[in-house]
């Protein structure tokens, strides 16, 4: 569970194994989709694995512009692409782990995030709940990232045939 110190569950928190996981990226069998709908990015935060293809599409009847701003030192390359109504989805992937802000240069209120990780991860639902699946037994550091509150970490042990648990409380600003 991820919540604020006011007791509210936090949506759009990305949780991932930042230490202890040495396996491969856990590429999903479904392609993550970042949609431009009602002049908002949906989901607001899109988590994915390093090297995983994802699609950017538009459901709006207006032209949008998708402009991720990765740190060039990571090896991820910024891009800036217009997407008119009815355009085919744009397929992309990222080379390195990073939290990447996304903006629309046409509609300045539109912003979102790509969170690129290696290994098992989860994003909280609207109540702050999450489950990280496919975690082998071992000792890990779980990192929770939220766009306003930043990062927190916790040590977690997953026993053979068992599950680990980590609850995060972020101090409201």
Residues covered by each model-derived region:
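A short, solvent-exposed beta-strand micro-motif common in secreted/extracellular proteins
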Residues: 13-17, 54-58, 106, 138-147
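Short, surface-exposed beta-strand/beta-hairpin micro-motifs centered on an aromatic residue
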Residues: 79, 89-91, 121, 127-134
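Extracellular beta-sheet/turn segments enriched in Thr/Pro/Gly and aliphatic residues
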Residues: 19-49, 53-57, 88-92, 158-173
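Short, small-residue-biased leader/transition segments that mark boundaries at the very start
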Residues: 1-3
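Structured interaction patches on ligand/partner-binding surfaces of diverse proteins
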Residues: 83, 116-124, 149-166, 173
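A short, solvent-exposed loop/turn motif at the edges and junctions
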Residues: 20-22, 29-30, 40-43, 61-80, ...
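Short Pro-Gly-centered beta-turn/loop motif in secreted/extracellular proteins
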Residues: 7-10, 48-50, 94-96, 132-139
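A structural signal for beta-strand and strand-to-loop patches characteristic of beta-rich domains
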Residues: 99-101, 108-123
């Amino acid at each position: 569970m991820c919540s604020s110190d006011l007791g509210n569950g936090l949506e759009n928190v990305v949780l991932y194994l930042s230490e202890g996981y040495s396996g491969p990226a856990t590429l999903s069998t479904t392609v993550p989709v970042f949609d431009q709908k009602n002049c908002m990015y949906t989901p607001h935060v899109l988590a994915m694995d390093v090297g995983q293809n994802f699609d950017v599409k538009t459901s709006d009847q207006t032209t949008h512009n998708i402009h991720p701003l990765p740190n060039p030192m990571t090896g991820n390359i910024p891009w800036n692409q217009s997407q008119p109504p009815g355009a085919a989805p744009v397929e992309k992937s990222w080379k390195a782990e990073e939290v990447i802000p996304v903006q629309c240069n046409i509609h300045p209120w539109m912003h979102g995030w790509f969170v690129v990780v290696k290994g098992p991860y989860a994003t909280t639902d609207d109540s702050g709940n999450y489950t990280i699946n496919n975690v082998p037994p071992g000792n890990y550091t779980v990192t929770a990232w939220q766009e306003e509150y930043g990062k927190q970490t916790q040590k977690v042990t997953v026993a053979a045939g068992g599950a680990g648990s980590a609850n995060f409380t972020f101090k409201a600003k």
